[in-house]
Every structure is written in C-alpha cells, then in structure tokens.
From Swiss-Prot:
This is Alpha-(1->6)-mannopyranosyltransferase A. Belongs to the MptA/B family. It is found in: Membrane. The chain crosses the membrane at residues 38-58, 78-98, 112-132, 174-194, 198-218, 232-252, 278-298, 326-346, 350-370, 385-405, 414-434, 454-474, 477-497. Keywords: Acetylation, Glycosyltransferase, Membrane, Transferase, Transmembrane, Transmembrane helix. Involved in the latter stages of the biosynthesis of the alpha-(1->6) mannan core of lipomannan (LM). Catalyzes the addition of alpha-(1->6)-mannose residue. The modification N-acetylthreonine is found at T2. The gene is mptA. GO terms for molecular function: mannosyltransferase activity. It is an enzyme of class 2 (transferase). It is a multi-pass membrane protein.
C-alpha cells in the first residue's frame, strides 16, 4: 500500500520560502547603501503621484477628488502646489536615474539592482492619475466602442456618447482608432470589466501594460548577453529611464505593450526560437504598427539560422525565412482581427497624427524655423510649408528604411543596429511625434549604444524630451523659458554621465554603429 504524496504541500512551502527570500533580499537592498538611488527615485515617484492629483492629465470633473474634499488641488494655489510637487518629483527621479547611471558606468550595479529599482520606482506610479498625456481616456473610449458593438476603425469616440467621452481630448473625439486589434481587444476587456468607470479603467489599463514592462525587463539583458554587452546598462537605458517609466507607465501608453512584445520577440529570434519570436513581433504589430519595422530585419537572423543548422543556400534560406515569417504574420494577425471582429481600417487612421504640431520631429521643426526666418522676407503660409516638409520627411523614411535593411544584414548585431536606426529615423522624420515615441529606438539601442558618449547623449536627449512636455499633456516648445530650462537640464544630464568614473574591470561596450 502506497502512502499519499505530499508533493503539492512541499511545492507550496518551497514557493512560499522563495517569495520570502526574494522579499527579504529586496528589503535588504532597499535599506542598504546600494539602495540609495532606489530610495531617491521612490521619493520622486511619490511626489509625482501626489502632484498628479491636481497637475496631471486630470479629468474634466473628478467626483473622486470632490468626495474627499481635495478638488482644490486642481485650481488656483492648489494647482500651483500640485505643479511644484509634480515637477519636483520629476527632477528627483531624474537625479536618481543619473546617479544610478554613474554607478552603472563604474561597474557597481547588477541586474538585480536594476530589477529591484524598477519595482521600487514603479510602485507609486501605479496609483497615479495619468500624467503627461490624456491618451488613456481615448483608449477607454475606443474600447467602449468595440464593447458596444461599434467599429472603432469606422467611428470615433464621439459616435458613442457616454461618461468616458467627457475626458477624451477634443482632437481625438472624431478620430478613429490607429491601434491594432490586439490593443483594441485589451481596451474592450477593460471597459467590459469596469464599465464606464474612468478611475477603475485607468488603473486596470495600467495593469494591462505591466506584461510589456516585464517582457522588456526579461528580454533586454538577454539581448545584451547575446551581443556581449552589459545587461545592467541596457536596463538603465530602456527600463529605468524616466522617459519610459513616467510616460509609458505613469502616462499609460500602449507603447509599453508594443515595445515589450517587440523586444521579447527579437530576443527569442536571435536565440534561435524563430517561430515564437515572429509570433510575438506580430502581436506587437497588432498593438501598434511601428513594431513592424523590426520584422524584415529578423528575416536576416532566421536566414542565418537556416544556413547554419540546415545547410540552406543563401537564396533558399532567404526565401524560406521570408515566406514562413510572412505566413506566421498573416495567420496570427488574421486570428487577432477575427477575435476582435475588425478589419484593417486602423491602417488608414495612422495618418491622424498629422493633427499634432510640435518640434519633436525634423519636418515640423524645419517648417517652424523656415517660417519664422522667412516671413519677414516673403509671404509664406505655415501650413503649406508644413505639408512640404512633412512630405520630404516621408520620402526620407521611404528611401532610408530599405537601404538600412540591406545595409545591416551581416549578423545579429547588424540586424539590431538596423532596427534601432530605422526606428530613430521614423521618430525623427515622421509627420508628428510625441515623447513616448522615443521608447521605440531606446528599447532596441539599449544593448548596443553603451559607449560613454552614447550613454551621455541618451541621458541628455531623454532628459530634454522629459522636461519639455507639461504634466497635463501639452508642451512648452513655444516658450523660450521652458525651452532653455529643458536644454539646461539636458546639458547637465549629459555632463554628469560624460564625466562619470570609468567602469571597473569591465571592458568598454561596443557602440551602436558597426561596420559591415
């Protein structure tokens, strides 16, 4: 007679011990000398969350604040106080990030340090109202369209009047959804669960972004290891970067899902798990089309695997890799579209970004400069000029991407370099860009751009883009005071890391640009 197995009880006890051990290690790190940047960044995140109640991308009418008699934070002196708290929090978080960056460059930070710090910095932001963007309200309204039997690719939120519509930015109320079926399904899921409750919807939607962050944390060190570069540095660039944490998680952007899925797909592909990698890339495209930039470069990676493992000839390997990748893409995308019950109408909505006019892209910046300098010499219509510069930008993108695809084909490092450059060119020359768009190239460049100059440049650019936008979602690029404050902060960030101590015992990493 056999005795009953106690394996489930043993497994439960083992899991409990593991959780206790991890929490104990996290506590020791947080309270120890290595946890200084983590504690400082946590304080900054708390200030952002507190200040966001009044100065963030708040609702038109906030019954929750009114019910606890805190609505005064949104007006007059209360708004001033909220703004001070929020901007102080941003400054503190940037200081913590730069301080951690100096430790990374000195070789004093580990991957555990990066992961633990991410958890600590993120915790307060999970409770924040949306900051630096009102997009989450549009997401909820678009999800409600699908929930209520309407096609979000055929009608804007205005076609479905409800409580969610009140907080959508006017510019987007008549705009159809420019997102893929996977994200529309996520937004529908949220609105099915919470109904038209904006607060609960915002919190649940933010939680739905967490898998993207987890995938980014998982994939980035693996890509760095595959390329022979420094995992903690890569995590510092693309995960702990306040531009990522504050905008993508604090602001609740679907870029978090897209970037996480895309990076994980790239990591799986370079490790030889090609089918799984292409599936994840396709799901990322079904969140936001930008992830599609990576797909052609991964064909080169798969081609090499077929040649090395199966002895395929170059042309045969290319045709096989391209055909199978295309087949996987079509199949996965068709399934997601069928589940969502939508077609390809979202592709036409991608042009909706032309409504945005700011200096974050070269075409729009060039149009502003030419108009400002030329209006005293000749008559020039700004919007006509803008259409011309944007058309030139699109031509630059259309010419550059195929050239980069062909140029960066030799090995895995080249393929990732090509993806990074392609995404950067798209961000710089697309008709309109927003701060969180810079998370696209950052995620891919993080395992590559690890030379001191590159790290300092990334710190400066990230700081400038972080500071130039306002917590309510507007920007300060037409205010000289705001512009020079952001520029001064960016130069300071660059200098702090450019002059930081050398890494101890760690060989300098390879810069992003490699030779053929």
């Amino acid at each position: 007679m056999t005795t009953p197995s106690h394996a489930p009880a043993v497994d439960l006890a083992t899991a409990k011990d593991a959780v206790v051990q991890h929490l104990s290690r996290l506590f020791e790190f947080t309270t120890g000398p290595q946890g200084g940047p983590a504690r400082l960044g946590f304080a900054g995140a708390v200030l952002i969350t507190a200040g966001g109640l009044g100065a963030g991308s708040v609702r038109q009418h906030d019954p929750l604040l009114e019910s606890i008699h805190m609505s005064w934070l949104r007006f007059g002196h209360g708004l001033v106080l909220s703004s001070i708290l929020l901007w102080t929090g941003v400054g503190v978080m940037l200081l913590a990030w730069l301080g951690l960056g100096r430790r990374v460059l000195a070789g004093e930070a580990t991957e555990f340090t990066m992961r633990a710090t991410t958890v600590i910095w993120l915790a307060p932001l999970l409770l924040s109202v949306p900051v630096f963007s009102r997009d989450t309200y549009s997401y909820l309204a678009q999800g409600a369209l699908l929930r209520d039997g309407l096609d979000p690719y055929a009608v804007g939120p205005v076609g479905n009047p409800n409580a969610l519509l009140d907080d959508v930015s006017p510019i987007w109320t008549i705009t159809t959804a420019p997102y893929g079926p996977a994200f529309i399904l996520v937004a529908k899921f949220v609105t099915v669960i919470v109904g038209n409750n904006v607060v609960a919807g915002t919190m649940l939607l933010r939680l739905c972004m967490l898998p993207g962050l987890a995938l980014l944390v998982w994939a980035t060190p693996r890509l760095a290891s595959h390329l022979g570069t420094h995992g903690p540095t890569a995590l510092w660039i693309c995960v702990l970067n306040p531009l990522v944490l504050i905008h993508l998680m604090g602001g609740v952007h679907n870029e978090m899902l897209m970037v996480g899925l895309m990076t994980a797909g790239i990591a799986l592909t370079v490790q030889g798990r090609n089918v799984a990698g292409i599936i994840l890339i396709t799901v990322a495209i079904a969140v936001k089309a930008t992830a599609g930039i990576a797909l052609p470069f991964l064909v080169w990676v798969w081609l090499r695997h077929l040649r090395e493992r199966r002895g395929y000839r170059p042309v045969q390997a290319f045709l096989a890799a391209a055909a199978i990748s295309l087949l996987i893409f079509v199949a996965v995308f068709a399934v997601l579209s069928a589940v969502a019950g939508v077609g390809l109408g979202w592709l036409t909505a991608l042009a909706g970004s032309v409504k945005i006019i700011n200096w974050l892209t070269v075409p729009t910046g060039a149009a502003n400069v030419i108009h400002a300098l030329g209006r005293g010499l000749f008559t020039v219509d700004f919007y006509t000029l803008l259409r011309i510069t944007r058309l030139i930008g699109i031509v630059i993108i259309a010419v550059s991407l195929p050239l980069l695809w062909w140029r960066f084909r030799r090995d895995d490092r080249a393929a990732l370099t090509g993806v990074a450059w392609s995404m950067l060119i798209v961000v710089l020359f697309v008709p309109a860009a927003l701060p969180w768009y810079y998370s696209w190239p950052l995620a891919v460049a993080a395992p590559l751009a690890q030379a001191r100059r590159a790290i300092a440049a990334i710190a400066g650019l990230s700081t400038w883009v972080m500071v130039i936008f306002k917590p309510d979602g507007s920007h300060g690029m037409y205010s000289w005071l705001h512009f020079w404050i952001a520029t001064a902060c960016a130069l300071t960030a660059w200098y702090v890391l450019y002059r930081s101590p050398d890494r101890r015992g760690v060989q300098a990493a390879t810069p992003v640009v490699n030779t053929p």
